[in-house]
Amino acid sequence: MTASKRVAKELEDLQKELPKYLRNLCSEEDNVLVWHALLLPERPPYNLKAFRLCISFPREYPFQPPTVKFTTRIYHPNVDRDGRVCLPIISKKNWKASTRTCQVLEALNMLVNQPEPGQPVRLELAEQLTQDPELFDQMAQEFTLQFGVDRPS
């Protein structure tokens, strides 16, 4: 099965039973290997708004992992300033061809709801989260309200 066929099938399956934390899941009109979605985290401070995502699949998928990038800015120790996510399930070291995109999205949702300061890409935010969680929550809330996308009803 080619990457395009597998990705199209996974997209179709996900759209049939879209998890409650996702909205507006679609591929680019002329490229099924690039998806866009809206992530709706459940926990504060991220549950105040939604966040746009872009998921890009390489032509070698499923033998190479997809990349996940936030296109909405987010104050999070596991997301760099460019929106790239440190998500172990899609690291080259941990990737398995049997992993499905729904599992990647579930892991991403869990990571957003529960930041992992032990695997940061933004060390200063991980330190803030562990040393002053109240300040981290306040900053993350302000950032979320400023840059987040209104949640669909």
From Swiss-Prot:
Indicate the enzyme's highest-level EC class. Answer: transferase
Q: Which GO terms describe its cellular component?
A: nucleus
Annotated PROSITE patterns: UBC_1, UBC_2
- What does the record give as the active site? C86
Indicate the secretion signal residues: none
UniProt record, GO biological process: ISG15-protein conjugation; protein polyubiquitination; ubiquitin-dependent protein catabolic process
- What is known about its processing and modification? ISGylated.
Pathway where this protein functions? Protein modification; protein ubiquitination
KW ATP-binding (keyword) present? yes
Keywords assigned by UniProt, alphabetized: ATP-binding, Nucleotide-binding, Transferase, Ubl conjugation, Ubl conjugation pathway
Q: Pfam families, per this entry?
A: UQ_con
Q: What is its EC number?
A: 2.3.2.23
The domain of life is Eukaryota
Molecular function via GO:
ATP binding; ISG15 transferase activity; ubiquitin conjugating enzyme activity
Please name every pair of cysteines joined by a disulfide bond in this record. none
The protein's annotated catalytic reaction(s) are: S-ubiquitinyl-[E1 ubiquitin-activating enzyme]-L-cysteine + [E2 ubiquitin-conjugating enzyme]-L-cysteine = [E1 ubiquitin-activating enzyme]-L-cysteine + S-ubiquitinyl-[E2 ubiquitin-conjugating enzyme]-L-cysteine
Family that this chain belongs to: Belongs to the ubiquitin-conjugating enzyme family.
Protein role = Catalyzes the covalent attachment of ubiquitin to other proteins. Functions in the E6/E6-AP-induced ubiquitination of p53/TP53. Promotes ubiquitination and subsequent proteasomal degradation of FLT3.
Q: How does it assemble?
A: Interacts with RNF19A, RNF19B and RNF144B. Interacts with FLT3 (tyrosine phosphorylated).
Q: What is this protein called?
A: Ubiquitin/ISG15-conjugating enzyme E2 L6
Q: What is the lineage of its organism?
A: Eukaryota, Metazoa, Chordata, Craniata, Vertebrata
